[in-house]
């Protein structure tokens, strides 16, 4: 390694941004093929390349940060700023879905019967599965905070227990959401109600899956003693992301499930 006189990480050339972009193209194209032609081949190819990219990119970052010591305090500060900006961009992303929902529901057009929910739509009961989902995500927010405090105090076993509980609650939420979709009396093609409901809750569900994956990686890293009380930004970023997912769900629940029904 050549000598450097600064605290910043000069990243080596990497193929993973390219393969990540390719997998994103394959997944989005595959989703369209699945919706319109009921073919999942392209979607499966996209998911496979995405999983391989994630595994190898995470492996490289872990090697650079944990084993090569490239993540100095200055680098960590840059990563923190990057994660904050990423979460802000996600807030704006979901703002678009809420905008579409309120644009359609606050002044329903004559085509919708002049009412919301539109004529013929039977909305889900907000006091059944959606309320259980809310409880599950709020509980996971408590357990991820417990994990963070345990890590800061150097209590490895409690951190692992709390992180495992958070992951289990995330998986449980995903299964509940899948069962709700399966039982729903309307589909994504049922006008603007179906579109806004499934796109908003579906993208949130996707973010829960991404967050759960992030936490699973952190769980295995903690098993291998990668985190210390002073050097654990990977876990901190996952916790921030999980709290963001929690807050978005609260807005979804109040807006779409409770008020929108």
Swiss-Prot record:
Entry's Gene Ontology BP terms: mitochondrial electron transport, cytochrome c to oxygen; respiratory chain complex IV assembly
PROSITE patterns attached to this UniProt entry: COX3 (PS50253)
Domain of life according to the entry: Eukaryota
Catalytic activity, reaction form: 4 Fe(II)-[cytochrome c] + O2 + 8 H(+)(in) = 4 Fe(III)-[cytochrome c] + 2 H2O + 4 H(+)(out)
Protein topology in the membrane: Multi-pass membrane protein
Ranges in the topological domain labelled Mitochondrial matrix: 1-15, 67-72, 153-155, 224-232
GO cellular component: mitochondrial inner membrane; respiratory chain complex IV
Matches recorded under SUPFAM superfamilies: Cytochrome c oxidase subunit III-like
Membrane side Mitochondrial intermembrane: residue ranges: 35-40, 106-128, 184-190, 257-261
The enzyme's E.C. designation: 7.1.1.9
This protein's UniProt keywords: Membrane, Mitochondrion, Mitochondrion inner membrane, Translocase, Transmembrane, Transmembrane helix
Cellular compartments annotated: Mitochondrion inner membrane
Residues annotated as transmembrane: 16-34, 41-66, 73-105, 129-152, 156-183, 191-223, 233-256
UniProt GO molecular function: cytochrome-c oxidase activity
Role noted for this protein: Component of the cytochrome c oxidase, the last enzyme in the mitochondrial electron transport chain which drives oxidative phosphorylation. The respiratory chain contains 3 multisubunit complexes succinate dehydrogenase (complex II, CII), ubiquinol-cytochrome c oxidoreductase (cytochrome b-c1 complex, complex III, CIII) and cytochrome c oxidase (complex IV, CIV), that cooperate to transfer electrons derived from NADH and succinate to molecular oxygen, creating an electrochemical gradient over the inner membrane that drives transmembrane transport and the ATP synthase.
Assembly description: Component of the cytochrome c oxidase (complex IV, CIV), a multisubunit enzyme composed of 14 subunits. The complex is composed of a catalytic core of 3 subunits MT-CO1, MT-CO2 and MT-CO3, encoded in the mitochondrial DNA, and 11 supernumerary subunits COX4I, COX5A, COX5B, COX6A, COX6B, COX6C, COX7A, COX7B, COX7C, COX8 and NDUFA4, which are encoded in the nuclear genome.
Similarity comment text for this entry: Belongs to the cytochrome c oxidase subunit 3 family.
PANTHER family, per the entry: CYTOCHROME C OXIDASE SUBUNIT 3, CYTOCHROME C OXIDASE SUBUNIT III
Protein's name in the database: Cytochrome c oxidase subunit 3
Organism of this sequence: Nanger granti (Grant's gazelle)
Recorded name of the encoding gene: MT-CO3
């Amino acid at each position: 390694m050549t000598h450097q006189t600064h605290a910043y990480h000069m990243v080596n050339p990497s193929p993973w941004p390219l393969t990540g972009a390719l997998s994103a193209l394959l997944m989005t194209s595959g989703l369209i093929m699945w919706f319109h032609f009921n073919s999942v081949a392209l979607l499966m190819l996209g998911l496979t390349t995405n999983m391989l990219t994630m595994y190898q990119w995470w492996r490289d970052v872990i090697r650079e940060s944990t084993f090569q010591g490239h993540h100095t305090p200055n680098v960590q500060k840059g990563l923190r700023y990057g994660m904050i900006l990423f979460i802000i961009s996600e807030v704006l992303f979901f703002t678009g879905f809420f905008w579409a929902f309120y644009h359609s529901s606050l002044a329903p057009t004559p085509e919708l019967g002049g009412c919301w929910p539109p004529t013929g739509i039977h909305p889900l009961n907000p006091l059944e599965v959606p309320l259980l989902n809310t409880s599950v995500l709020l509980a996971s927010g408590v357990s991820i905070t417990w994990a963070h405090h345990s890590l800061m105090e150097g209590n490895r076993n409690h951190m692992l227990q709390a992180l495992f509980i958070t992951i289990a609650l995330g998986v449980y939420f995903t299964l509940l959401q899948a069962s709700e979709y399966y039982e729903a009396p309307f589909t994504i093609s049922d006008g603007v109600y179906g579109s806004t409901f499934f796109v908003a809750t579906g993208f949130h569900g996707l973010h829960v899956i991404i967050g759960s994956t992030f936490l699973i990686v952190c769980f295995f890293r903690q098993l291998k003693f990668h985190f210390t009380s002073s050097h654990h930004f990977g876990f901190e970023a996952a916790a921030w992301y999980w709290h963001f997912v929690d807050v978005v769900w609260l807005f979804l629940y109040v807006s779409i499930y409770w008020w929108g029904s």
